[in-house]
Amino acid sequence: MELATVNWVAYVVPIAVTTTIIISAMMARRRRRRAERSPCARPPPVAAGAPLVGVLPWLLAKGPLQVIRDAHAELGSVFTVRLLHREVTFLVGPDVSSHFYQGLDSEVSQDEVSRFTIPTFGPGVAFDVDLATRREQIRFFGDAMKPAKLRTYAGLMVREVEEYFTRWGESGMVDLKQELELLVTLVASRCLFGEEVRSKMLREAATHLRELNDGMRLVTILFPHLPIPAHRRRDRARARLGEIFSDMVRSRREAGRPVDDMLQCLIDSRYKDGRATTDTELVGMLLSALFAGQHTSSSTGTWTGARLLARANAEHLRAAVREQERVVGRYGDRVDYEVLQEMETLHRCIKEVLRLHPPAMMLLRHARRSFTVRTREGDEYEVPAGRTIASPLLIHNRLPQVYRDPERYEPGRFCPGRGEDGAGGAFSYTAFGGGRHACVGEAFAYMQIKVIWSHLLRNFEMEMVSPFPETDWNVVMPGPKGKVMLRYKRRNMSPTVKITNPHTRYVC
């Protein structure tokens, strides 16, 4: 027995010693690497702030855009801002944004930072459900936004827009912001719900959607149920819209008559386990689609008018009008999906508006695991697990290293051969997000705005009466502040109009 023990010890001890040496060497190497990296992979610098409340006093005094701009100018492309009980690390620019947009949901999550939307969209959808269910619901929307469906929606949009503007006289003055809020609600509801609800939806839905947007304020991100007037109006509006949409869903199911619109697509959708969508889910999905689409298109449509009709941008307005003359000369009064795809100048005009006036102030994520980012200057920062991270679109899309003269409205920057957004690399243009969570409604939004402005440019001479609008920074999805008054005079862009060179393109 003693001999066996000695033999066992003689066999095991060398292995144990060798293993210990190897593990010690590996740990020492890891410590050396960590020590070598520690001077670079340090925590992001923190913006100056008051005790306990952080940057809140500066936020109230300067507004969110200026606070973020100041911190970016002082601290660079990676910095942290303290706001009450929360620390937010901002990642500015394509060099440090890859993980934000491409990271796995297990590493970079939307859930923890987006639950403030639940009072707006309601139960059973979006961030009230688990990731697997939300992915399937996004798939339902994606199926409803495929090119074949967009071709159908284009015809519906054109008819609604043409009918709406018959209400305008030969000349007059209107609040463009209010007009487009109503029109976009009408157009979106036609594509979403069908013709039978069109008149019922118009003014009441537009009012309630405005109350929903007004109820999604900056304070909502931190305190979504704070008993303030804006939240009370939001809750009442959500309840009323829920009633309207529930009636629509019930009526459609009872009719049993298939209709070619988004509601029918969502009713016909099935989860992977074969389950159909419930009425509660349908109401929430319809509301979220209408809310997002109505705000993005009406706000962007208004900004498009404000930019194109500004005196400094007369050249871009002329280019957009000339393009409509070419299209009319080629196709007459026909406007459909294919014709809209040829409106490249108008598309660039809208894209540039979205660069300067994105639908959201910033995008948020929650870091479930720590990660390291490297700036274009070569500095490394480690973002810790548990941190809220933000991509500030208002700064991100105006970087001088990506866009030449970034504060200037210049649609030509997106022309072929110039393509500043492409030259800047991935995630240089993020008006509709990007990566794993790019907006599925981007093509729908562009098409809707193009239909509206194609009609306006063809049929009206326009002049902006109001000063260039300020931005309403009080809400999460900022838009033009106040009235945007426009004077118009009807004109006829005849298909027989003489075009000097029908193949002339906007000079980039």
Give residue spans per PLM region.
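Cytochrome P450 heme-binding "Cys pocket" and the immediately downstream C-terminal segment
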Residues: N313-H316, E442-G479, K483
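Conserved cytochrome P450 K-helix/beta-meander segment immediately N-terminal to the heme-binding cysteine loop
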Residues: S391-E420, N501-T504
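Cytochrome P450 heme-thiolate "Cys pocket" and heme-binding signature region
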Residues: D143, P416-I449, D472-V475, P480
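Short, small-residue alpha-helix embedded
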Residues: T296-L309, I452
